[in-house]
Each structure stands twice: as C-alpha cells, then as structure tokens.
C-alpha cells in the first residue's frame, strides 16, 4: 500500500469543486491528503474547502501550470493524483490508482479517459469521440508513449521529482498535463488504462469559442515544448534509452 495525495487546481469554480470533493469523500480508499490549489478565486472556494476539511493553497502566479506544479510540490504522499475541478471520480478511483501504480513500480504514471456529463449532446459526443481519442492517439504518437490527461491521472512521487524542475510554471496559456507529458524522461513509464475513468464536464465543448481556446492552448504548449526539444529528437532519445535499459 502507498499513501496518496490528490491535487485539484481551481479558479472560481466553487460549485463543481464541492461535487468533486464530495466524490472524494465517498472513495472506497480515502485519500491521505487532498490539496486544492486556489489560483485567485473570488467566489466561495475557500468556504467550500473549509467545509470539506481539505487543505487549500493560494497561488498568485496565474495559470493552471503554476497551480498544478505548486500542488505537486506540496504533496507529501508516495502517489500524487490529479483531478480537474469538475472531475467526478467513481468510488473506486483511488483504489484502482493505488493498485495500478503499486504493481507498476517506482517511476510510473497512469492516466485514463473521461466520461462527459452535462453540456449539450453534441458537446458530450465531441469530447468522448473526438477530443479524448484524438488526444490519446495523436499526442501519444508524437510522444512515443501515452499522454497524461489532466482530469484523470496519477504518478509516483519519484516520477514527479524527475520532471518538477522542467515543467513550464510561468506560462499561463500552457496545458499543464501536456507540458508534464512532454517533460517525462525515458526512465519514467506512462500507462493508459481505459477502465480508469472519471466523470468530466462537457462545458468546454458548449461553444466554438471554448473549444477553440483549448486548441489554442494546445498549440501554444507544443510551440513551447518544440523549442526546447524537437519531437523527433525526443522520440529518438527515448528509443535509445529503451533499447539500452528495457531488454
């Protein structure tokens, strides 16, 4: 068994945060620590955290990348799990996370898909049939391993130590999960578990503006990553390491 911290970055999303925290309170395997990273909320996020009895950390540096990294830095457990504010994990989510990562070893991460709720029927269809599969396969092909999906992933603390100094904390328009995925070194294995699912809000797909914003952040993230290491060079480096160490 391992200890588990759950990190939830948030900003002005008190209502879905309360639902997420209620879902965590119903886990068959309770978290050892829940950290809500408040990135400048002006609503009643602080009151929601106090009522749930979870730790709230205020972060002034704007952007989800800064908030997530701070939460991971503060986590004190052997496994660090990540949810979005509107994620709704099923009751056995942490139990599954612990079992997978305890089997997988000390330098591992695991991610899974989302089941979209709310929003429009088209938005739910778009998220479940285009966005998640496209992200999984297109970004996975680019990386040479599965990507992390920010609404639903976890990693061992040792894996975070490998990338914490490399992530782009000071770039507000960067997708933190995509950035972390790109910074994962060859010695860290990433697993994709289709059965490890959480509820995810379909609201980002309710309008072309919201969907376009997500795509814009993705392109910005790719531009930042490619300047530091082109994808082909990254894949070759990972391939060389795998040939040497995973025979």
Please place each PLM-identified region on the residue numbering.
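Short beta-strand-to-loop acidic/aromatic patch adjacent to the donor-nucleotide binding site
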Residues: 78-88
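A conserved acidic beta->alpha catalytic loop
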Residues: 23, 38-46, 87
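Acidic helix N-cap motif at the loop->helix transition within catalytic regions
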Residues: 15-18, 43-51
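Short, flexible, basic/aromatic active-site loop/helix in glycosyltransferases
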Residues: 112-118, 125-146
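Conserved donor NDP-sugar-binding/catalytic core segment of glycosyltransferases
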Residues: 92-123
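Glycine-rich, basic loop-to-helix element that forms the pyrophosphate-binding segment
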Residues: 59-75
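Acidic donor-binding loop at a coil-to-helix junction in glycosyltransferase catalytic cores
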Residues: 171-180
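Short, acidic, metal-binding catalytic loop of nucleotide-sugar glycosyltransferases
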Residues: 23-31
């Amino acid at each position: 068994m391992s200890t588990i911290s759950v990190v939830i970055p948030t900003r002005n999303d008190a209502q879905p945060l309360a639902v997420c925290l209620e879902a965590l309170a119903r886990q068959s395997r309770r978290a050892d620590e829940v950290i809500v990273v408040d990135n400048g909320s002006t609503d009643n996020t602080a009151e929601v955290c106090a009522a749930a009895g979870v730790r709230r950390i205020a972060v002034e540096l704007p952007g989800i990348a800064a908030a997530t990294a701070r939460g991971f830095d503060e986590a004190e457990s052997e496994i660090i799990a990540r949810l979005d504010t509107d994620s709704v994990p099923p009751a056995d989510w942490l139990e599954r996370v612990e079992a997978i990562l305890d089997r997988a070893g000390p330098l591992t991460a695991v991610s899974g898909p989302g089941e979209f709720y709310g929003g429009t029927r088209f938005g739910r269809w778009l998220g479940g049939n285009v966005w998640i599969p496209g992200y999984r396969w297109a970004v996975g092909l680019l990386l040479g391993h599965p990507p992390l999906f920010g609404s639903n992933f976890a990693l061992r603390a040792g894996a975070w130590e490998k990338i914490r100094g490399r992530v782009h904390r000071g770039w507000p328009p960067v997708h933190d999960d995509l950035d972390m995925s790109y910074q994962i070194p060859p010695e860290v294995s990433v697993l994709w578990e289709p059965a490890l699912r959480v509820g995810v809000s379909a609201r980002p797909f309710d309008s072309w503006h919201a969907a376009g914003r997500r795509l814009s952040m993705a392109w910005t993230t790719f531009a930042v990553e490619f300047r530091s290491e082109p994808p082909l060079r990254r894949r070759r480096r990972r391939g060389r390491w795998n040939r040497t160490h995973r025979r």
